Every structure is written in structure tokens, then in C-alpha cells.
Amino acid sequence: MHHAPGPITNPEPTEAPDIAPSDLLKAALNDGPAPAFKIVSWNLLRRVGAAIEDVIALIEQESPDLLLMQEATRAIGFLKERVGGHYAWAPLPGRIHGLAMWSPTPFPTPPRTVSLPSGAVVHRVCQVLDLGTFGVANVHLSHGQMLNRRQLRRIVAGLPPRAAVLGDYNIVGPALVPGFRDVGPRRPTHAMIEVLPLRLDRCLARGLVCRDSAVLPRGPSDHRPIVVHLSPEPEAGQPRTLRGMAAAAERLRRAGARARIGLRDPER
């Protein structure tokens, strides 16, 4: 039986650390790899699945840079009041649920809602977010191979060269999209794994490296959350110091944003 975690109070905001040029230079000279961007994706199962308390517990546990949700109801929008951060919801036409994104830092640009080829019953949309370094599409695709592939073609046509498509793919076989690789975890993600192992939740990526991935334990939903750590593939010919300075700036920016809303830094 699932026991919802107790209420979580918002921590006192703290001052974001100043980013001094000397800090950037020191970190750049270390020339480590660009920091991986942590994305968690979870199908919440509408009203009968994960509640806002379960989503809060996931945020507190995983500290994602971006949380993607499918079958999110209007009630999930209270995340901003409960844990801070930034939230965008794209309801499916005529439905009580839709797609949602949460981030501890401001979205570089507002997420776009894109209409998809749809079946007779459910009209599908996807959310597209441009992070600057790469694009992210949050999807809950239709059953049926032909319609599924048409939806994927529509989605990737509007994505930048570096991009990731995450969410509930609703397919059992391979998701074939030219130029994209399936970089998500390989373990089953659906509750029917005792009967039939289904890997419905996936991440396809282009121009990105997946540093790590995982399937998280099951909660009250029939889907398990998936986690991927993505970073852009290095550009040929870019000076090492410039790569290091960009990576250092990104690390310090995220640390400052997390300090403002009281989340722990997962890289520490």
C-alpha cells in the first residue's frame, strides 16, 4: 500500500552565490565535461495515480533540472506554491489531464504546445521547450504504430539539431526516428511487468550524450519514472578552455538557482 509523504514546507530562500570571473576561470582550467542536464519523466495516471504529494517527494528525492509529466491534472499546478520553481501545463483538448513541465529555474523561453495528428477519441498535443543548448519534447503518444510514427515525425520536424523526446511512447517495439538514438533506460517501465515487460517510457535523442539513466521504483502510478542525464555532444574544433568556461558557467548558474529555492545540488 502506498503511503503519501507528509506535507513539505517551503524552505527559507537563501541568497544565490555571486559568480566571480575568477571562479569561472578556475573551473574552466579544470576543463571537465559539460554538466549533464538531469531530466525526470513520469506518467502520473490522472486522478487515480500520483498526487501532488508524490510529485513533491520525487522532486525532493531526485532534484531534477527538468521534470516532465504526462496525465497531469490541474491540481499538479500547485507545485509552484508548494516547492517553488516554474510550471507549465498543456491540457489535452476535452480531457481533465495533459502534459506538464516543472523546473527549479526559469524556462529560457515559454514551452510551446504543438498539436499532433490524432485518432478519433483522444486529441494529442506535445510540449516543446528550447533550453538554448538543446530542445526537449514532452510526449504522450497514441497507441497504434502508424499514428504513433506520424506524431513523432511532426514533433521532430520542429526541434533544433540537438534535441530529446521523452515521455510515454505507448509502443512496445522500437521507436524509429531518423537521426535519433534510443538512449533511455532499458528496463520495463509499466506496471504490467509481472505479466508482460513493457518499456513504454523512453528517451530518444539527437546530438546529445546520455551520461546516465535509470528507472525509479514504482509509486502510485502504473508507470515508473525514468531519469536521464543529458549533455550536448562536443563540437569539433571548439577550444578546450571555452568548453570549460561554458561548463563552469552552467554549473554555477544552476547552483545559484537551486540555492534560491532551497533544493540540494545533486553534483555535491
Please provide the spans of the model-predicted regions.
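Structured beta-strand-rich core segments of catalytic domains in phosphoester-bond hydrolases
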Residues: H2-L25, L29, V48, L66-F134, ...
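Structured catalytic cores of enzymes that bind and process phosphorylated ligands/cofactors
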Residues: H2, Q127, R199, S221-H229
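Metal-dependent phosphoesterases centered on the DNase I-like endonuclease/exonuclease/phosphatase
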Residues: Q145-D212, P217-R218, P239-R268
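N-terminal, active-site-proximal structural segment of metallo-dependent hydrolase catalytic domains
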Residues: M1-E81, E233-R268
